[in-house]
Amino acid sequence: MKKVSILSLHLGYGGIEKSIVALANLLCESYKVEIACVYKLYDKSVFELDKRVKVKYLTKIKPNKKEFHEYLKKKKVFKTLKEGIKGIKGLYIRKNSTINYIENTNSDIIISTRDIFDEWLGQFGKEGVLKIGWEHNHYHDDMGYANEIVRATSKLDYLVLVSESLKEFYSKKLVNTNCKCIYIPNILDNMPKKMSTLTEKRLVSVGRLSKEKGYMDLLALYNIISKEYPTWSLDIIGDGSEREKLENYIKEHNLGDKVTLHGFQNKEYIDKILNKSSIYLMTSYTESFGIVLIEAMSHGLPCIAFDDAEGARELIDSGRTGYLIKNRNNRAYIQKIEDLMDDLETRKRIGKESREEVKKYDGKEVIKKWLQIMKEK
C-alpha cells in the first residue's frame, strides 16, 4: 500500500486542521497515511482521527506568538526580547525539522497545507514524489499574498483550491509552470440523519472568535433584534482573541440571559446545538470556504451571511439556500433574520434546499477527486 504524508502546522482547533483530519480519515481506506505535525498543542488531535492514521510530531517546541505580543503590549522589554529570541529559534527549528522530514520520508505523495510548506516541498521534495499544495485561504485582493502562493507552489505538481473562483484565479497565475490547479471542495464528514425541526427560537453561529469573523458585529445586530424578538436566543460556539470583548459587550447590554458563549466544543456537541437551532448567522469579513456553513446547511438550517465572505458566495444561492447581504448592510441583514423568524414555512423551504445543496460535499464524493489526482503515483 502506498504512503501519503500530510504536512500540518498542528492538530488543534481550526478549519485547516479539521479539513486535514477529514481527508486523512478518508484516505486511509486506500493509502498508508501519516500526518507530519510541527507543533504538539494537545495530547491528541482535537478532531477525531482514524486509528489507522499515524501522527508524527516533528518538534517539541510550541508557538509563542501570543506571549510575545502580550509582553510587547505591556512594554516589558526584557521578557519581550526573551520571547522574540525564543520565537526566532522556534522558526529555525520548524524549518529544519520540516525540510528534514520532506527529504527523508518514504512517502509516495506529500500534501502541503501551508504556503511555507509549499515552498520547502517544491525545493526539497524528492524526485518521483507527487507533490500537492492545498490552499485554504483567500487572497482577498492582496496581490502580495497571491504572488507568494504562486512563487511557493510553482514547483509542485498540483495546487488544490477549495473554491472554483480561486482555481480560476491561480490557473491564470500558474499558466507558465508545471503546477496544475484543481478545484476540490472541503469535506462534509458527516451528513446528519435528521434535519432540525426549525421550530426552536434559537439563532446560532460557529467559528473562531477573532476580528475577521465579525462577532462584535453579530452581537450588535442581535442586540437590536432582541428588543423586538425577546424570546429568540443566540448561541455562539468557538473561542479566540475576541472573547473578552464579546463578554464585556454582553454584560454591558444585559444580554447574559439570551446569549451563550459555548467556547470550543467537539463535533458531537456542535451538531446537537445546530440540530436544535432554526437560523444560522455568519458575519465574517472573509471566508475561503466555510466548513461550518456547510455543516449548518446539512442540518437544514437557512443561513444568512454578508457577501464579502467569498466562501459564502459560493455556498449560498441567495433566496434559495439562504441569504447573502450586500455591502455589509446591517439593516438588510436584520430584515432577513426577522423575515425568517416570522415565517416557519420559509425556514423549512430554504432549509430543505440547503440540505440538498451540500450533499455534493459529502466525503464519499469529494474523496473521488483526491484519488483521481493521486492515481498518477
Residue ranges and their predicted role:
Residues 231, 332, 339, 346-360, ...:
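A short, well-ordered alpha-helix in the C-terminal region of glycosyltransferases
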Residues 247-265:
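Nucleotide-activated donor-binding/catalytic signature segment of Leloir-type glycosyltransferases, i.e.
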Residues 285:
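Aromatic "clamp/platform" in nucleotide-sugar-dependent glycosyltransferases that forms part
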